[in-house]
Amino acid sequence: MSRKRIHRYFAGILALGVLGAGFSWAQAPAQPSPEYKPQFADDPARSDSEAQALGYMRVVLRAQNTYKKRHSHYAESLHALAGTGSFTKRMAQTTDRGDYTASFLYRRESPDREQFALTMTPKHLDSSHRSFFAEEDGAIHADDQKPASLDSPKVR
């Protein structure tokens, strides 16, 4: 066999191998995502993404309580809250939290009445990516049909 013929032969075998691998990969059944394993007793999360979103919310809520004890009022933004408790400056830099987007709203109605709301909105709402809502009372509400609000059921 000539050298040119050998190169064509191996190129043909390689092409068939690549095509075969491509076809078998395309026909392979999709692997179901592993079932969520609770991180602690009574974990209300339904997925790893929810666990991360709820963890972020708990950190913000604890930091707000600490901030209020130190300054006699709540932080007016996530940037102002940064460095309080375990809420880091890096956590305050972006509202993109993986599969979720965080939103923070502060409102002062009078010198002795202030409110804040924290929401975690999933990029794709479904039963394992619920939306979450919390206010200054610290209760976290969840909904898998629409954006969570004060009227949504509380998570455990």
Describe the predicted segments one by one.
Residues 23-25:
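Sec/Tat signal peptide C-region and signal peptidase I cleavage site
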Residues 2-12:
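Bacterial N-terminal signal peptides that target proteins for export
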Residues 29-48, 55, 59-129, 134, ...:
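Extracellular/periplasmic head regions of type IV pilus-like filament subunits
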Residues 11-21:
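Bacterial N-terminal signal peptides
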